[in-house]
């Protein structure tokens, strides 16, 4: 039986006093890809921020257990060191910090956490060359400031490059398809698929079904008003694509 990577039970959370998550239940096992869909404002991105420990979001009930450990006891950087990775919908630009230095510092922080010797610049450059092929990135991007002047597709590929370097146990991709054309979407998706293995898990958050043509999920969940109200397979995403999110109003609000 596969190990449970993430177990969320009756999770409630708020931001600025407003309750956003209203009883989320979710279990993700090793080797699985899960997708969460839902209209804007349903709580999808809030869930990703709560899992990763964003300080603006307060857990008001329930629990998040990651590999047997209560996540509420960990600071955001501790969650990252424990193997949780978040690919942002809108990656930040950091002028003056080269992409290479950022990746090397992040990678060495993980090695230090694991009790391993840090890599010097030369050894790290050897390591990163093979990772660049995963997302088809030109090595010249390593010398540029982090995400500065990058196109939307380049920023998203850079997020997957970070994922390839850090080899997280749980990857959360928050609307990784946002703003991507078909070619960029294909490259990013191929990178995600390449990095999948029996020991890790991926949570894909998306608004549109088209991403799931490239990253094939094992389970699809639909969020509505802060809860997961439906779960299923690929057919559920196709049904949403055909009927639109308005059909959820009929399904969820229909009298019992």
Curated annotation (Swiss-Prot):
Q: Which GO terms describe its molecular function?
A: ATP binding; ATP hydrolysis activity
Q: Which UniProt keywords apply?
A: ATP-binding, Nucleotide-binding, Transport
InterPro entries, alphabetized:
ABC_transporter-like_ATP-bd (IPR003439), ABC_transporter-like_CS (IPR017871), FeS-cluster_ATPase_SufC (IPR010230), P-loop_NTPase (IPR027417)
Q: Output the CDD domains linked to this UniProt entry.
A: ABC_FeS_Assembly (cd03217)
Q: Can you say what this protein is called? A: Probable ATP-dependent transporter slr0075
Q: Gene3D superfamilies, per this entry?
A: P-loop containing nucleotide triphosphate hydrolases
Domain (ABC transporter) spans: 6-250
Do the record's keywords include Nucleotide-binding? yes
The domain of life for this entry's organism is: Bacteria
Q: Does the keyword Nucleotide-binding apply?
A: yes
Which family, according to UniProt?
Belongs to the ABC transporter superfamily. Ycf16 family.
For binding ATP, which residues are annotated in this chain's numbering?
Answer: 38-45
